[in-house]
């Protein structure tokens, strides 16, 4: 603080900061209106600020600029972004192996293309999130999520799948389970002799 009146200089705009409008961070003073991320201009507070030397950033921009880089250093779901950090002055570099794998796909039909929805294996119509039930690794309509033989409505606890079709446990056991004496209700009865 200067000896002869006034206040400290703002770390962002270099103008005088008076006590009523002052926010301190990392030993520097800022106006409340100047306390923004230096990269994305998002308003900051004491819980969202990350300081680096004389610069202040939101935690996302700080992580992109100064955080660890490479595979395995993602920040949860936030790392699943197409943002390459160019607005931060960062350049994205792919290794030759990554570039080759990005251009070739081992199974292009496994995922729906952007803007398309997944198709129900039973009726072939689009399956939307509100009516989606997963079974056998595929999306089904709730109304189509039935046993292929008896038509019984299925749940995740009583579903079995074979060759892309769904079955209740009873029908699966009768049609695809072990067979012979002692299985599936067939028993060998021995008659008693008197």
Swiss-Prot record:
Q: Where in the cell is it found?
A: Nucleus; Cytoplasm, Cytoskeleton; Cytoplasm; Cytoplasm, Myofibril, Sarcomere, Z line
Q: Which SMART domains match?
A: LIM
Question: Which residues does the record list as Phosphoserine (modified residue)?
Answer: 95, 153
Question: Per the Swiss-Prot or TrEMBL record, what residue ranges does the short sequence motif Nuclear localization signal cover?
Answer: 64-69
Q: Where is this region: Interaction with TCAP?
A: 1-5
Chief localization: nucleus
The LIM zinc-binding domain is annotated at 10-61, 120-171
Q: Which InterPro entries match?
A: Znf_LIM
Stretches the record annotates as Interaction with CLF2: 94-106
Q: Which Gene3D superfamilies match?
A: Cysteine Rich Protein
Would you kindly state one Gene Ontology biological process term found in this protein's UniProt entry?
A: glucose homeostasis
One Pfam annotation reads: LIM
Entry's Gene Ontology cellular component terms = cytoplasm; cytoskeleton; cytosol; nucleoplasm; nucleus; Z disc
What GO terms are given for molecular function? actin binding; actinin binding; identical protein binding; metal ion binding; structural constituent of muscle; telethonin binding
Annotated keywords = Actin-binding, Cytoplasm, Cytoskeleton, Developmental protein, Differentiation, LIM domain, Metal-binding, Myogenesis, Nucleus, Phosphoprotein, Repeat, Transcription, Transcription regulation, Zinc
Q: Does the keyword Ubl conjugation apply?
A: no
> PANTHER family per the record?
CYSTEINE AND GLYCINE-RICH PROTEIN 3, RHO-GTPASE-ACTIVATING PROTEIN LRG1
Instruction: Quote the function comment for this protein.
Output: Positive regulator of myogenesis. Acts as a cofactor for myogenic bHLH transcription factors such as MYOD1, and probably MYOG and MYF6. Enhances the DNA-binding activity of the MYOD1:TCF3 isoform E47 complex and may promote formation of a functional MYOD1:TCF3 isoform E47:MEF2A complex involved in myogenesis. Plays a crucial and specific role in the organization of cytosolic structures in cardiomyocytes. Could play a role in mechanical stretch sensing. May be a scaffold protein that promotes the assembly of interacting proteins at Z-line structures.
Subunit structure, interactors included? Self-associates. Oligomeric in the cytoplasm and monomeric in the nucleus. Homooligomers preferentially form along the actin cytoskeleton. Interacts with TCAP, LDHD, MYOD1, MYOG, ACTN2, NRAP, MYF6. Interacts (via N-terminus) with GLRX3 (via C-terminus) and PPP3CA; GLRX3 and calcineurin compete for interaction with CSRP3. Interacts with CFL2; the stoichiometry influences F-actin depolymerization and possibly two molecules of CFL2 can interact with one molecule of CSRP3 resulting in the highest functional impact; the interaction is stronger with phosphorylated CFL2.
What does the UniProt entry state concerning the protein's domains?
LIM zinc-binding domain 1 is required for self-association. LIM zinc-binding domain 1 and LIM zinc-binding domain 2 both are required for optimal actin-bundling activity. LIM zinc-binding domain 1 mediates binding to MYOD1. LIM zinc-binding domain 2 mediates binding to SPTB.
What is the name of the protein in this document?
Cysteine and glycine-rich protein 3
Organism classification: Eukaryota, Metazoa, Chordata, Craniata, Vertebrata
Tell me the name of the encoding gene: CSRP3
């Amino acid at each position: 603080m200067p000896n002869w009146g006034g206040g400290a200089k703002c770390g962002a705009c270099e103008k005088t900061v008076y006590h009523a409008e002052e926010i301190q961070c990392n030993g520097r003073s800022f106006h409340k209106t100047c306390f923004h991320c230096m990269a994305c201009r998002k308003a900051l507070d004491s819980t969202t600020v990350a300081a680096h030397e004389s610069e202040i950033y939101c935690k996302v921009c700080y992580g992109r600029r100064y955080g660890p880089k490479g595979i395995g250093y993602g920040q949860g779901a936030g790392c699943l972004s197409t943002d390459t950090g160019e607005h931060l002055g960062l350049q994205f570099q792919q290794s030759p192996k990554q570039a080759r794998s990005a251009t070739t796909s081992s199974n292009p039909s496994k995922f729906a293309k952007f803007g398309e929805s997944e198709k129900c294996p039973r009726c072939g119509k689009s399956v939307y999130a509100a009516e989606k039930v997963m079974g056998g690794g595929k999306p089904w309509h709730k109304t189509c999520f039935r046993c292929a033989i008896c038509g019984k409505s299925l749940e995740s606890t009583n579903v079995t799948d074979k060759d892309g079709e769904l079955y209740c446990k009873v029908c699966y056991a009768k049609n695809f389970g072990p067979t012979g004496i002692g299985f599936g209700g067939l028993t060998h009865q021995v008659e008693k002799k008197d």
